[in-house]
């Protein structure tokens, strides 16, 4: 086992196969977290000297809830997400999230993936990965809604257990509005803007390129 860990929290509905193409540097282990129906984090990370967290989309808030401040993170990078993922100013507007939740069909899932990928080419690439069952991702979305909905969201800082060191924002994000991401991150940590859709991982071959 290595002394450096790259810990990745995926977004809603993602299958792990859509990230396995990304390689780690020598001496680095990779751990992928996905499927937020169960938020118990069983792994013991205490043997790692360095933990580099990368969280995408809904994974930003899910990482905060799952890790609950238990580990010192060397770096923490948010990609197209914020700690306030269901929020009219800082996340996905509540009515849009609720609309997705209330009637999620296979057709809606297709539309979601299309918007997430932004172009036919990227979508074709993404659709090669095995999709998770509709009932499962529906259930996951409900759990995410419940996880995010309980807290009083008066002050964003009160609910943040992770010191985020960097945010990456896709300017062409049609899922998690770039303007709302900017609203949240500006003044909180360094921000890198990229020209990409909500799913930007096709841009990179290695995790350290982020």
Describe the residue ranges of each PLM region:
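Conserved HGGG/HGGXW glycine-rich cap/lid loop of the alpha/beta-hydrolase fold
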Residues: 1-40
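Short alpha-helix in the alpha/beta-hydrolase fold that links the catalytic acid
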Residues: 21, 163, 176-187, 205
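Gly/Ala-rich beta-loop-alpha elbow adjacent to hydrolase catalytic centers
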Residues: 54-63
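Catalytic histidine-centered segment of alpha/beta-hydrolase-like enzymes
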Residues: 175, 191-210
């Amino acid at each position: 086992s290595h002394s450096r860990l790259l810990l990745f929290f995926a977004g809603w509905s993602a299958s792990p196969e859509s990230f396995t193409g990304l390689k780690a540097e020598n001496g680095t282990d990779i751990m992928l977290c996905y499927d937020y129906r169960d938020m118990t984090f069983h792994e013991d990370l205490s043997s790692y000297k360095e933990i580099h967290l990368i969280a995408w989309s809904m994974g930003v808030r899910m990482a905060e809830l799952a890790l609950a401040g238990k580990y010192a993170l060397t770096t923490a990078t948010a990609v197209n997400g914020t700690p306030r993922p269901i929020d009219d100013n800082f996340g996905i507007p509540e009515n849009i999230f609720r609309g997705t939740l209330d009637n999620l069909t296979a057709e809606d899932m297709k539309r979601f993936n299309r918007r997430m990928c932004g172009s036919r080419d990227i979508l074709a690439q993404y659709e090669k990965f095995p999709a998770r069952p509709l009932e499962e991702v529906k259930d996951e979305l409900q759990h995410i809604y419940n996880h995010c909905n309980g807290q009083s969201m008066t002050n964003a800082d009160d609910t943040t257990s992770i010191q985020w060191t960097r945010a990456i924002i896709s300017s062409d994000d049609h899922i998690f509005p770039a303007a709302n991401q900017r609203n949240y991150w500006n003044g909180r940590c360094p921000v890198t803007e990229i020209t990409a859709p909500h799913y930007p991982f096709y841009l990179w071959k290695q995790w350290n390129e982020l």
